[in-house]
Amino acid sequence: MKVFNRPGYLHQHTMGMDVEGREHFVVVIKGSFDFPARSGAVAEASATHVPLVAADEATGEPGFSATRWETDFAFRKPMCDVVVQGAAYAPEGRRAERVQVGLRVGGWQKSFHVVGQREWRVMGPSVRATDPYPFERQEFGYDTAFGGVDRLNPDDPTPPAFMSNPHGLGFASFRNQAKLSGQPLPLTEEVGAPVTSPYEDYRPMALGPIWRGREDRLRYGGTYDQDWQDNVFPFLPSDFDERYYQQVGEDQQIAKPERSLDVVLLNLTPSGREAFRLPDPALPVRLFREWETACNEVIYPDTLIFDTEARQLSMTWRVDVPIKRSVTEFTECWIGRPRGGLIRAKEAGKSYMSLAASE
């Protein structure tokens, strides 16, 4: 397929399947933008765009650690995911035991506390936390949020786990209390809900992708029972919901932005507060089957990723079109507002030569 990519974003095509079993041609587009030096300015296109992520990338051993970056090749996303990976910085570089971090995009916002390293201490019949260790900079994510698997008893074949976040820290079962001293607490807490017990049900606080088995995501994944195996496989179950493709919880999903929005980062960079605007999120895309227009839309990003350590924002767009015969029927794709010569050549039924075109 020939691609005319005027903005120079990264792009790749793949295939997806809907619940009815219909195959779709999917184009995924990703552009990266640098945080501006001037407060309130618009983020500018990066010299080098962040590569598309082909498969989920974990912070450690896959399946036993949190997701750092989730694949860019989801089929569809009804909402826009807001994702942050980075670290907390103490205000003015002064070591602190607790720092509130936050992000605001348009009218949406989320904030929580990042806390210094602590340990559980068993004191007679009770369990207490040590004082937080002061920090200037501290990374955080779901592998340091509340949760985890209680492996204090090596002979337990089915150790208890905090299923909302089995990759986290701080959770334990009461039956292993005697071995709890020295075990780490989470590095993040919900504002107004400090972690004071390993046995309570706390909300894991982070800004990255959630694991695919989390209840509020898994419930959209569909039912894979014997009836599905006998009568539906290899297609999706009828109760599969495309909200499963959202890589963050509902508290980090926003409507797909159709205009530039204000962004504010709190204590996620050394400066303490960063304020800038999203670049124009509207992206015209046109797909062709030979001379037939298969799709002519203005699309909006369904994923915003803030890599605060790199001072970079990435936006991801996607569009899908049902396949009539085969994936090779799609012959041309225009990304961005096309040049006049390209439009005139298409209308005249002629080929258009451009150094910007790629196969």
Which residue ranges define each predicted feature?
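Extended intrinsically disordered or low-complexity segments
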Residues: 2-359
